[in-house]
Amino acid sequence: MKLLGKAVLVTGASRGLGQALMATLARRGARVVGVARHAGEMEAAAAALRAEGLDAHALTYDVGDKEAIYPLVGAATALVGPIDVLVNNASTLGPTPLPLLLDTACEDLQRVLEVNVVGAFRLTKAVAGSMVVRGQGLVLNISSDAAVSAYPRWGAYSVSKVALEHLSRIWAAELEGTGVSFLNVDPGEMDTRMYRDAVPDADYSKLNRPEVVAARLVALLEGRAESLPSGTRLEASKLEAA
């Protein structure tokens, strides 16, 4: 896929992997809209890229709020045109320190699912119709190794990523032949604020930098993404950077 001129929507783009993806995509010529709940951080990230002469925009919405989805997509489309690539990156862990399932409040589980699964589902629904009509589009869902491993205390987050991945596979089956494809990517353990909140005693020097992972994901998009079967699951650690 040639990213030059492509309209890309990245959620959770005010920090961490989302911010790194937004920057890397913009520097490859994409027209990027970043979305996050934190207005100041989101606008600062976009403004820094615009200062480089890049096509980057900031929107402030909560993807876990169903009333925000269509205004979000409408605003993004007004800025860069119909979305070619959607990156569902926004995630929440729920309360930290991470609790055991026995101690997890139902309301906290519900919030994690609203953001990580239902929000991504709503956004995908909101952009997929246009993609089908145009005969092209890619949805990149940022998953986790927690989707395949049962880590104590990561229950709510793990369940959300399992659901997100399987939704991708069902989307892939239902939209086969339309030109719209779906990929799940496990970025691996990264030195992000979210990971530090979850694992405060980790050796952060051994974790991946978001910028490194972003470079690998963008290389995937520019390389073999379109040739992979829709619904494929990938690990960023096994990808090559551009």
Tell me the role of every PLM-derived stretch.
Residues 97-101, 105-110:
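Substrate-binding pocket helix/loop in short-chain dehydrogenase/reductase
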Residues 124, 160:
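Active-site helix of classical SDR
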